[in-house]
Curated annotation (Swiss-Prot):
Coiled coil: none annotated. It comes from Yarrowia lipolytica (strain CLIB 122 / E 150). GO terms for cellular component: chromatin; nucleus. One of its GO terms (biological process) is establishment of sister chromatid cohesion. NCBIfam families: rad3. It catalyses: Couples ATP hydrolysis with the unwinding of duplex DNA at the replication fork by translocating in the 5'-3' direction. This creates two antiparallel DNA single strands (ssDNA). The leading ssDNA polymer is the template for DNA polymerase III holoenzyme which synthesizes a continuous strand; ATP + H2O = ADP + phosphate + H(+). ATP-dependent DNA helicase important for chromosome transmission and normal cell cycle progression in G(2)/M. May have a role in changing DNA topology to allow the loading of proteins involved in maintaining sister chromatid cohesion in the vicinity of the centromeres. Has a specific role in chromosome segregation during meiosis II. InterPro entries: ATP-dep_Helicase_C, DinG/Rad3-like, DNA/RNA_helicase_DEAH_CS, Helic_SF1/SF2_ATP-bd_DinG/Rad3, Helicase-like_DEXD_c2, P-loop_NTPase, RAD3-like_helicase_DEAD, Rad3/Chl1-like. Residues 5-388 form the Helicase ATP-binding domain. It is found in: Nucleus. Its cofactor is [4Fe-4S] cluster. Gene3D superfamilies: P-loop containing nucleotide triphosphate hydrolases. This is ATP-dependent DNA helicase CHL1. ATP binds at residues 40-47.
Amino acid sequence: MENTKRREFSHPYTPYPIQVDFMEALYDCIESYKVGIFESPTGTGKTLSLICGSMTWLRKNKAQLAVSTASADENEPAWVLEQTIQLAREEFSRNREMLQKRLDKMRRKNMRARISYEQGFKRAKKAPEPVDDSQFLPEDYSEVIKPEVQRLLSALAPPVENDFQEPVKIIFASRTHSQLSQFVGQMQHTTFPPSSDLQDLESTKLISLGSRKQLCINPRVSHMNSVQAMNDACRDLREGKKGGCKYYKNPHDALGKVDINTFRDTTLAEILDIEDLYKLGKHTSTCPYYASRASIPASEVITVPYQILLSRSARKAIDLPVKNSIVIIDEAHNLLDTITSLHTMSITKSQVSSASSGLQKYQHKFQNRLNSGNRVNLGYLVNMLQALEVFFEKAQKFHKKETAPGTPVTTSSLFDGSTADLINVNRLEKYIDESKIVFKIESYLEHVNGETQEKSHSSSLVLSSVMEFLRQVNNPDSEGVLCFDGPTKLKYQLLDPSEPFKDIVENARCVVLAGGTMEPTGDYLEYLLPYLSQDQIKLFSCGHVIPPQNLSVQVIPNGPNYSFNFTFDKRNDEKMILDVAITLLVYSKIIPEGMVVFFPSYKYLEQVVAVWKKAKKDGKNIYEILNDQKRIFVESQHDSVEKTLSEYAEEVPKGAILLSVVGGKMSEGINFSDGLARAVFMIGLPFPNLMSAEIIAKRKYIEQSVSEKMKAKGVSAKEALEASKGAARDFYMNICLRAVNQSVGRAIRHANDYACIFLLDGRFGKPEIQKKLSKWMREGIREGSFKEALGEVQQFFASHEKN
């Protein structure tokens, strides 16, 4: 292995020691084909460490690849090998030099005719057009395509040409497009040595990929409510008889290829984010959704949202080159939940009724104008929806226990007693895909509903939801379950997220899960990567960039008058709730600037505020008294988070308190640096609802799978039962502690920042709880009486006032 002391990572700034450790560990992880779980707290420069560590490996690997390919035949004489290697290096450099010159030329052209990013382009609204009923009709449908015709069509399709291909790529995925834009912004600050010493310069070639929702520039498609309808509308335009989509450039057409190549070179000449691509597409009248794919072969880095990377069908749709790539998943603390939610669907009785009604309206209007293929399949769809309506009507008459959340439902029972169970759902699914019927029906329903935003959304989007649910139920994952979520709601839930993720792990060279709060890591090993041995996984966790004296973590087991125990059966104690207010009031007098207080749920936050406003002292309630000390702002489930945060930030210099919710809008993606959070208070342990359908189904699955594994090892039934119950409890606790880590982790943003973290609940003193907290919190955690903690906090802020 290369001497790590000699590695130069081209970090744009002088890296902290923990950043160097991170980059070294990442380089080794990629080199050794491992799956890495990397934790680097918020504010430690995680993104730049990911970029510099992976790009350094990529550039060095490209140079080594050219030499190793040329020296494959070791039986040749030394002088022949040397000459072959030299020729390979020259060819390698020549190819990249040609690409670099082409991109430099495009970059100069862009500078002379710079797109006006500041002005931007407003997304066009749908222009009113004369309505012709025929636009709502599907093409005549037939399943039969003769084999000889299919072969002829395949032979006539020319191959897509790409003049250059990078052998290994970095695929960077994150949850939101704003997070991906931040990554692109960081990438713009970096430069890396060329992969060949015969080159003077090699710019980083990055392409940002997105869905039609982010990139479609045709208003006739982009205004559609559902993904299915957008996909169908796009295909309808491209394949239709009325001129097609004017933005789509056919890669098999000479003029189309020129436009695509120009778009490709423009995107690779400079590092652009998804908004830049959208504007570029508008400026050049070129569809960025399709044209951006031409940039994939020559790119070194590809950015994608979770929805594309984590969906097999989405990866296939854009030909995402996972094979042999370095896959980096940022903000991976929510990866298990994201994979589960992407493969989880639910429908309600009202949705089915609405979809059935809309479908029958369409059928009634166009029945006599449809060919037999459309007529028959539309009839099948109506039958299936009517059967589901009957199922829900029966379910409402069941005993409450039979429809309790998490109660399994067999697929056959959905259509029991109707002819719908005789329908070939696979053929029906094929019909939905090929006929674009969802788009046609949604378009018609929008028209008849007067095209108001609310009406079109409610009457048409539900059809897509029901169709997606039927697809999922028809093609269940091996570890999924169909269950009730009350008498009027059905849920199909993925129970084993390792199955859909396995395809990525097995094909990629290296997979890195990175986040600011990856603790506790046990769930990733048990439920995401159970098929990997310990030596195939690299765990990395670093401390914070701040010195120890800049952080104080206090377990507060009791207030001035009462113990803090926010368990389900005790959290409604009004005396304890009032003691929380008194605790905040006492600390607000010694903590400068802003205090952020996290509650387990919106419902509990509302309950606490109501209690505070009810209890009065000297004519004022405790809420008003606290508000006089520091102005209180309350996160709302419905109001704009930007407005609340802006008003809070404005008040912070004078002193302010922000009451927030774990898992709410303020707990992720918002950084409370410096005065925005000189203190973070965590009120209780935010366990999820134990009686929700998701938790019940997941708990049952864990208990069953662990029990079966234990019994297979020869363990007694009693021990297997204890182990299975323990595993389910541990999973439940991990969800809670991950949420705690994520919420409090937003307080420290840079090396000179400082803050106090208060954990208000006696249970935070338990070792089994503390071991699941982030490493940087565990190292400085203190527990004492209310008075002792108050004294330490006074000293903490007094020392920072002097500095």
